[in-house]
Structures are given as C-alpha cells and as structure tokens.
C-alpha cells in the first residue's frame, strides 16, 4: 500500500466513536423517562393520589407502559375541550376525624355513676313503703268519717237546738277529729254541763237518734239515765255491775262490726260515786282497747251555777255586734268561753277525777228570743199554727233574769212542752 493514500480504517473508527457518544445519553434519557412514567402510573393507581387522578390521559411516551385497567376502560367522546377536563376532576375527600372510642362499661355523655350499696337501696324502698302507707291513711280519713255523716249531724243540731251555736260547733268538731280514724288509744269523753232547760238532754237524744241511723244497729247506742236505771232505793254496787255489763256488751259488739259506738249517760250528777269510778275505769290505759274505741257523752247539771254566774256577768258582751268590730268581739267571746271551760274544769275536778279526762262543753242560758223559738217549734210539732205573737205571750209567762237590757230564761225551755200541752 502506498504511503501517499490515506487509510480508511481510522475514518471508519471515528464514526463509531461519535455514534456511541450520542446513543449513550439518549438511552439514559429514555430510561429516566420510563422511570418517571412508571412512577406517575403508580401514583394514578393509588387512591387519592396526585392532581392527575381521573384524567385518564397518560403522558407522552408513557403509553407503552400503560396499565391493563386503563386499556380496558371504555373511551367516550365528548365536546369538552381539553382545557375543561382538569376542572372536572373530583375533589379530594376530607379525612374525617376518627371517633373517640369509650370503654364498654362507661357512658359517652354522663359521668360514671357511683356504685350504690344494698343498704341504701333498702332504705329507699322503706321510705317508699312508708310514704305509700301515709298517703293511704290520709285517703282513708275521709272514708271513715263519711260513714257517720257528721255534716248531716251538724245541720240537724243547728236546726233543732236553739241558742247554743258554740256548743254545737264544739261537739261536731271533737267528733270529726275523733272519727277520722277507727283505732284509738283513748276514748272520746264529752261532758255537757249547764243549768236545767238549756238543751243538754235534747242534744243527747238527737245524737242517739243520729248514730242509730248511721250505724244501722240500735244495739251500738246505749242511753243510760241515772234517775231511771239507778234510783236511790237500789244498791250502788248492783248499778255498777249492771253498767259495766251493758257497756262491755256494746263495745264488744262494736269491735266485731268495726264501728264506733255511742254511750249517752244522762243525769250524771245523780250517779253515786261507785258508778263514776266505774266510768273512770273505762278510760284507763290498762283496759281492753274495745273500751277505747267509743264515744262517751255525759249530761250533767253540775256546774250550772257557775255557768249562770258567768252568763250574767258577761251579758254585755253578748249585745248585737257592729260589723266593724265583729272580729275583735268574736275573739273576745272565744276567750271568754275558754275561761268558762277552765273554771268549770276546776270546779268539777274537785268532785271526781273523771272530769279531768273529759272535754268540757258548756251550755249557756237561753235568752227570750230562743225561748220564743222553742215555743214555735213545739207548737208546730203539736199541730198548732206557730204564731209569733202567741209564742211571745206564752214566753212572757216564764221567769227571766234581766241584766244589761237582756232577758235570760231561768228554766230555759224546760216548761215549754207542759205549757203547749195546756193549749
């Protein structure tokens, strides 16, 4: 080979070297591009990944490596421009805060209740039972009192008894309080005191009649007249035994029927001391409870002189009251009546201790107006026309105490029946 001709081997080696220098960077760029495409596709496959989620448009150069899911999804043609597609990309869902979990033995909103002991529960149950019993007892109070029709008794006494409004009110009030319950620790002992003819025996008869009607058994009402059942000729011990037997029979029968009997004893001032001792024995705590569930009404003229003196001394207080001074006068009258009961109790207690356990009910003197009312009532009952003028003429024939411009009958209405019978 001639030295003057250039050799072709170095010329061929130079293009090879330059080709290798160009291909190597291109291959590196392709590898980087493929890796970027793979990373982007992985982000697309992850939930909530990247802003390109849901576009479905792979980057140029990444189509050869597209996942199978993108190839299988159908393609729909729309008139939306490519610029509008990114605006419809779904927003990322906000991550909700996780719920706070509580233990199963506790509550979410209420504090944990402290454990109560069994003793506290038993105490609450006991309080509930006692409260129920108290309410039941309160409801039964009216039921037991309604059996005796005390409202009807009060109306009957106010209609038939003249001049004794305070005594009638006190009798009904005491009976109403006592008859509110059936079981009692002590009996009710009413002592009606006053002079003759003021209505004590009349009230006793009205009480006996009313209780016979409401109890529907006359055997539960005992009327004992000392003048008739125990005259002076009879031995006091025999009278005492008879009284004890009759009272025992009545209270035993009433206990069997679960009712409260009524025992009316008239002319108690004529009773010998053994009978008063027997009556006092009925009130003792050691006696059977049968004797405690009863109403004893004692009618006596003892203390009549004390009542007469009190009425005559306080006659001016009973004058017609002015409307402006009604309350003060009523309070003064109540205080005077309380003083009268206290003085009667002091006088009667000296005679026998029986009166210390009694509720004293004083019967005052009747004025002329009350006596006229007695005459009119008796005349109507006997078939006469109750003329006011004629009744006043009959009342004028009686004796009266004249004090402070008022007239009080000496014998009350005791002579009214005999006077009307002479018509």
From Swiss-Prot:
Recorded GO CC terms: endoplasmic reticulum lumen; extracellular region; membrane; nuclear envelope; platelet alpha granule lumen
InterPro entries with a match to the protein in the record: AAA+_ATPase, P-loop_NTPase, Torsin
Locations listed in the record: Membrane
Main localisation: membrane
A GO term for molecular function: ATP binding
Coiled-coil intervals, chain numbering: none
Modified residues (Phosphoserine): 63, 81, 106
Keywords of the record: ATP-binding, Membrane, Nucleotide-binding, Phosphoprotein, Transmembrane, Transmembrane helix
Region (Disordered), start-end ranges: 47-68
Name of this chain's protein: Torsin-4A
